[in-house]
Amino acid sequence: MAEDKELVATVGPVTWDGLKQELMALPKETLAELVNVWLTTYWTLQNYWMVYTEQCFGFESAAKLDELIWSKLVPAQAYRIIKVLNLGHDLQSLATLLKFTAPQWIGAGFAWEFTEVSDRRLAMVVHQCPMGTYRKAQNLELLPCRQLAPPLYIGLAKIINNKIEVTCLHAHPDPAKENVMCEWEFVLKD
């Protein structure tokens, strides 16, 4: 992969333009893997941050801080992705945003699918998420995603189009469903 193109450090400032040229020279496969490394690292940080904050300050404080952080992070990332991908205001644009946003990154441990994609309704099921997987492995209580996750999905949807309504169809602490962490519905209203 990266062996195909030699990366050499030189004396002088490291700039975005210079780094961008190096990235553009990488094989596409290497670049895609590098993006995956960054986003997987992002989720590793999120998992450790949440667990250690919870250990030090309790669950309520950790959940509140997590909510505050995500309420700022989601719009920042969404606007950047919308700009780069030139997304519109329909449910197809929301589906694209969901695929390319860090909170849904497949390589970081998410397994999910769209179960419906139409002009008026988008539905998705998350089968596995990195936080749930990590917490289960550590014998920790799952996060109450029915309360914590709506601001994330509502935020993403409203940035695409204020007329999109978001409904959580299933999430912890709802009774467990086999192979389902959570289910969401996005409906574009008139």
Stretches found by the model and what they are:
Residues 151-152:
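ATP phosphate-binding glycine-rich loop and adjacent ATP-lid/helix-beta elements
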